[in-house]
A protein has these predicted regions:
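Short loop-beta-helix segment that forms the pyridoxal 5′-phosphate
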Residues: 126-130, 134, 147-166
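Charged, compositionally biased N-terminal leader segments and the immediate start
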Residues: 1-28
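Gly-rich Lys/Arg/Thr-decorated short loops/hinges at beta-loop-alpha junctions or inter-strand turns
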Residues: 15-16, 116-128, 144-151, 178-180, ...
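Conserved PLP-enzyme active-site core in the AAT-like
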Residues: 163-288
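TRNA-binding/sensing appendages of the translation machinery
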Residues: 42-58, 65, 272-277
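N-terminal entrance/gating region of PLP-dependent enzymes' catalytic architecture
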Residues: 28, 51-55, 59-140, 146
Length: 288
């Protein structure tokens, strides 16, 4: 049992009303420190620091001003101070676009999905339960993507939309029976997606052409990447365009907005061979 009157124990500190983070979370306290110093032969914490820190970087209290780190804070005071600092941020409307969107994550989804401990265990987080919960979460995610894209299978998943687009380009190259060497990318594709496709294609020696569909020569390309909605927000029905390209021997990848797919005709129903997109739309905040 823990002695509540032991000034060096956590229980003792809390019993005395000492709710500072430094007492609760920063290493040992009281008799523990004394015993540890005696074990290693150091007379004090200052002596230990003087022996271990090189003199060229050691702050000498006798010659230099002490660090102004303030007094220890209680948990409530520390959280209030952090909230005050965060409130100084100015939140502006984002016009970044290019497939990146400001999002809202409804509290029921955050608590019951993202923070639901049932995904990994009902008691102690053993690895087996974490793996089982992760497997279930991935299965649900993949089924949702299948429903939204209209495809038969889905993975879970790649780094981002641009990486997925580059992987689609190489997958279509392997799946295609066409002798044409090039890959066509619609000009309305998000700019970062175009750049990653170009970078991947460079080392695979795949010629990439960025342009509009009406200028496309089907005999030059084995595959095409289309964007719907495109990077400027235009929405189209690609059914006829995809059918025309496939009739000419091209494989077609469509980059889509999965949230828009809730209302739009799915890319799979329009005939796409591969569908890619970004799950950032489902409530992941933007980070800079």
């Amino acid at each position: 049992m823990t002695d509540r009157n032991d000034s060096g124990s956590l229980a003792g500190l809390l019993a005395q009303g000492q709710d500072e983070f430094v007492a609760r979370h920063v290493g040992p306290a009281g008799d523990d420190v004394t015993q540890m110093l005696a074990t290693i032969g150091a007379g004090s914490l200052d002596a230990l620091v003087a022996e271990t820190v090189p003199g060229s970087i050691l702050l000498d209290p006798g010659n230099k001003p002490a660090l102004s780190i303030g007094e220890a804070r209680t948990e409530a005071a520390a959280l209030a101070e952090l909230a005050g600092l965060a409130a100084r941020n100015q939140v502006w409307r984002s016009y970044l676009g290019s497939g990146y969107h400001g999002t809202l994550t409804p509290e029921p989804i955050r608590r019951n999905v993202l923070e639901n401990p049932g995904w990994y265990t009902a008691y102690t987080p053993y690895q087996a339960e974490i793996s089982q919960g992760r497997l279930e979460a991935l299965m649900v995610f993949q089924q949702m993507i299948i429903d939204l894209t209209g495809m038969e299978v889905a993975n879970a998943s790649l780094l981002d939309e641009a990486t997925a687009a580059a992987e689609a380009m190489t997958m279509l190259r392997r799946a295609s029976t066409s002798k044409a060497p090039g890959y066509f990318v619609e000009a309305g594709t998000h700019p970062q997606v175009i750049e990653v496709i170009r970078t991947r294609a460079r080392w695979l020696e795949i010629p990439v052409t960025v342009g509009t569909l009406d200028a496309l020569d089907p005999g030059t390309f084995y595959g095409a990447h289309l964007q719907n909605p495109d990077t400027e927000g235009r929405v189209r029905d690609l059914t006829d365009d995809i059918a025309r390209l496939q009739a000419a021997g091209l494989k077609v990848c469509v980059g889509t907005d999965p949230l828009a797919a809730v209302l739009l005709k799915s890319a799979g129903a329009q005939g796409a061979d591969v569908v890619i997109g970004s799950a950032q739309r489902f409530g992941i905040p933007l980070g800079f």
